[in-house]
Amino acid sequence: MICSTPKDESRIHQNTLLRSLQRGFTLTEVMTVIAVVGVLLAIIIPSLKSLSDQAAGATELAAARQLSQGYVGYATDTNGELMPGYLSQSPGDEHYEGNYDVQGPDGNLLGGPAKRRWTWRILPYLDDAVDSLFVNEARQYIDQRRGTDGFAYLTSVFPSFGLNGEWIGGMQGSIYGDLHTLGRFTGQCYYAQRLAEVQRPADQLLFGSSRGGGPQGDSDVEGFFFIQSPYYLTTGWRWAEDEDGGPLYEEPLAPSKSGYLSLRIRGKSATSMLDGSTALRSMQELADMRLWTNQAWKPDWVLDLQNP
């Protein structure tokens, strides 16, 4: 009988291991691994997306709150006067653009539409941080245009949030200034001009996640300086309608048919109220006129010029 030596046993073990490695995995083993990996990915990927959505939502809500605080800070500095969403081009008006000095990105004084929009006028109440106007996807859009000739203009048009300027502060010289124009004909003002006029600041919508049509026919941009209420001043519903004339909330909708609101956070818009509170709201929730103006006493409220 020949006894194996330790060296022989080591060689046998190595040969066995080598043959095992050369053999590789069986089809059953490979399929099992693939199935396990698939299950793990099915669990992990939605979780990662959910975490990403939650982070984006938290970022938007924080930015919306900061904007509301800046807006109220302006009102505090002006003895309760609310910041106009758009300045007038008529010298006789109280909020004539010539009465304002508005600094641009390099400290230079702005003129034209970039000056008239609220965007650059609120920056002194946000520590002059242009970046505070842009979050998530909108930050990428504006970062690509820094240092260009059109930066100040594009910044004024496409902040991440739109102001409810039709009912708060007014849109005097804007194409969205129908409510102001109506008041000039009737001799009344239908939008809030001062903090004291807003009786329920916690119910008064100020800013919302927005989107607008891109410049020169480009695709829509996540951001716009203005958001628009669902009902027109006196005639009723003005957002998108279905075939039967009822409200249509299904995306995608043109910005002008959805109040320039963006539902980019899990199908909702990040909103802030005049008191600084914030919430994610759906289109159905934002279709309630009681959020847009304290004058409204029902969801489908419109101005009644016969019984003011």
Residue map of PLM features:
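N-terminal leader/signal peptides at the extreme start of proteins
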Residues: 1-25
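Intrinsic-disorder/low-complexity peptide segments enriched for small residues
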Residues: 15-19, 25, 39, 124, ...
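Residue-level signal for well-ordered alpha-helical scaffold segments within enzymatic catalytic domains
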Residues: 4, 42, 46, 50, ...
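Amphipathic alpha-helical segments typified by the pilin-like N-terminal helix
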Residues: 22-62
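Intrinsically disordered, low-complexity segments enriched in glycine/proline and serine/threonine
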Residues: 10-12, 17, 52, 244-246, ...
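Short, well-structured segments within or immediately adjacent to enzyme catalytic domains
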Residues: 60-308
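Intrinsically disordered, low-complexity serine/threonine-rich segments
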Residues: 6-7, 13, 29, 135, ...
